[in-house]
Amino acid sequence: MENEFKLKVEDVQDKITKNTKAIILNSPSNPTGAVMEKEDIKAIADLSMDHNFLIISDEIYEKIIYDKKHYSPAKYSDNVITINGFSKTYAMTGLRIGYLTANEEHTEELFKIHQNSIACANSTAQKGAYEALTGPQDEVHKMVSEFKKRRDLIVSRLNGMGYETVNAEGAFYVFPKIEDENFVKKAADAGVVTVSGAAFGSNGKGHVRMSYANSYENIEKAMDILEERVVNG
């Protein structure tokens, strides 16, 4: 839970070698909900120029941020491939439509792979994505406001149970510190689905990912179940 799960420029700088070709950034983060600070984004972007490596920036949750602002490394470096889509911001997961942006050199190389892999997203999905992107954004703001309420609820309840939980700044996940290796199974047996932090790599051990992409009422119910049947059961 160091730095509230936020990647710092020092973490990257220490790992760069002459063999470094690319790094992946994910902010806001799945599974932690962390949002990187502007100064770290900019500093890592500067490193990509100094050491000539690519940043692959996964920004699928860029609009789901609470009380902060999203910063893309593409604003500060030309060595960036930005990945984004419509699944999260516009709740269009079933339509499977996304996009990337990059400089012309990288786009030409990416197109060679793309044109021999798939043709294009279906026209219905493309039209839906266009309307979502160009239309009123009121519903997006409402959804983010509702996610914030759900976040406040789940963070408060988990901390109240004794599970140290960082206040997520984006996306719709929390990553509480839970050492019990059997917690995920106990929770599932009680009817609450969670994901072991180890599923996201060795650094995730000792944590559990929980999503609050559900109704406020269902989250309350889930927290009651965990408290009664897993924590105190």
What positions do the PLM features span?
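PLP-dependent class I/II
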Residues: 1-233
